[in-house]
Amino acid sequence: MKPLLVIFNPRSIPEFYKAIEKINGISKLWIKYFPQDEAYNKARLFFLQSDYTHFMILPDDLIVTQADVDAIVNYDESYDSISGLCNNTGRDDTNIDTNISAFLPPDPPRTATYEGYRWFKIAQFESLLSKVENSDAIIPVLHQGFALSRLSRRLIEQVRFRTDAGCCVDSCLSLDLMKFRVGFTQYVDIRIRMKHLKIPRSELLVGKEKAIMLFEN
């Protein structure tokens, strides 16, 4: 397996930079300050023109550890889409909901409401973890809001990223819709929990800083 960690970086978040400095043993592609549609398409094209086998998505408002990255990398290659989970920042209290839903996003995604997703609660997964064996901690889901994710090359080849203007997390919502339609199942390991930061949209530097791609081998 040869994974590429793709870091979507439209902001400048010190806590994220401090965390990512500690991540080693994996190639990194930084997509900095591009509009969302350009960012995902440029990353996809770079990946498809390379010999990397897996596309790993990391947004810059998610704090991950080396253990998180290693765990996601080391899953069996039979998983076309697998991720951890994180807290959801859609409420003032960011420690109630997860980023996981058992329901598909609406189409188009911009018509979604927060309540409409019926997010799993953090407490639900904590309770489940206390009762299941490790082998039962990996569950199929219809939507997860971009915790650290690993996507196979065949998935990236078949599923294009698309955006739906007006939706704050449109690329992940649209990607979930397309994965489902093409026939891919996505899985979440509920043992791997990451910290999702609540960052105001005013912190976006798209259009304010020069858009660049940086590769670190």
Spans of model-derived segments:
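A short acidic, amphipathic alpha-helical/loop segment
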Residues: 18-19, 42-43, 68-72
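Active-site nucleotide-sugar/metal-binding loop of Leloir-type enzymes
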Residues: 41-54
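A short, glycine-/small-residue-rich helix N-cap motif at loop->alpha-helix starts
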Residues: 34-40, 166-167
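Conserved catalytic core of nucleotide-sugar-dependent glycosyltransferases
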Residues: 65-162
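Short, high-confidence coil segments that cap the C-terminus of an alpha-helix
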Residues: 52, 78-81, 183-184
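N-proximal low-complexity "stem/linker" segments adjacent to membrane-targeting elements
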Residues: 1-31, 38
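Short beta-strand-to-loop acidic/aromatic patch adjacent to the donor-nucleotide binding site
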Residues: 52-63
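C-terminal catalytic/acceptor-binding lobe
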Residues: 143-145, 153, 158-217
